[in-house]
A protein has these predicted regions:
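PLP-dependent class I/II
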Residues: 1-217
């Protein structure tokens, strides 16, 4: 099995190119592999063009496509969807029953009610705009307070960015200092597992509330 997040991979935010997507499908076909395509942030795109899903490029029914409502409806709505060949779906159904029987009926009913009465695409559009403004605010703060000291991936979507600090800089210690100074980072040890880099979420931040912690390389 191949597990991949082709759109805004976590944590670095890399998006798989169209050519690489076709190569991955060809590789799966050649070796008889199942591809698990996880796309929790695919619909939170600020710029650029959406690329075809791996599932749409699948020619042999090998791709299981996963989507999530938690990023586009309600954060606490921990449900999503699966797109796969019928033979795979029947097996997944059996595994689901063995794992936890079923998803919350109330959550499924709430999502179904929303989808029956609202246009999901129209609902997502203002979210993309709001996230784009928050993203630009945090990038402006980085450019203002950490000029030429922090590099970030070129984020075209998703509600967080991946920052890389200078060589020898302990990102974990820095995040802990920020937590003490600003009371903003709740789990710094989870945000900066690899020394020198950190994932900076901004979904809950208002642009004017973004902190400006002291940075001393």
């Amino acid at each position: 099995m191949i597990y991949t997040v082709p759109d805004f991979q976590n944590p670095a935010g890399v998006t798989l190119s169209f050519a690489r997507r076709k190569q991955l499908i060809a590789l799966a076909n050649c070796h008889g592999l199942i591809v698990l395509e996880d796309t929790p942030c695919r619909h939170i795109r600020f710029s650029g063009q959406n690329l075809p899903t791996l599932q749409s490029l699948d020619t042999e029914g090998r791709v299981i496509h996963l989507g999530s409502f938690s990023k586009v409806l309600v954060p606490g709505l921990r449900i999503g969807w699966v797109v796969a060949a019928p033979a795979l779906l029947s097996r997944l159904g059996l595994l689901r029953v063995a794992a936890d029987t079923q998803t919350s009926t109330l959550q499924m009913a709430a999502a179904s009610l929303f989808l029956d009465h609202h246009d999901l695409t129209a609902h997502i559009a203002p979210l993309q705009t709001a996230y784009a403004r928050k993203q630009e605010a945090i990038l402006d703060a980085i450019r203002q307070h950490f000029p030429q000291k922090i590099t970030v991936t070129d984020p075209e979507g998703r509600p967080f960015i991946w920052a890389t600090f200078p060589d020898g800089f302990d990102a974990t210690a820095f995040m802990r200092d920020v937590a003490l100074q600003q009371a903003r980072v709740r789990k710094p040890n989870l945000l900066a597992k690899a020394t020198g880099s950190a994932r900076l979420p901004f979904a809950n931040q208002r642009p004017r509330s973004l902190p400006a912690p002291t940075f001393d390389p």
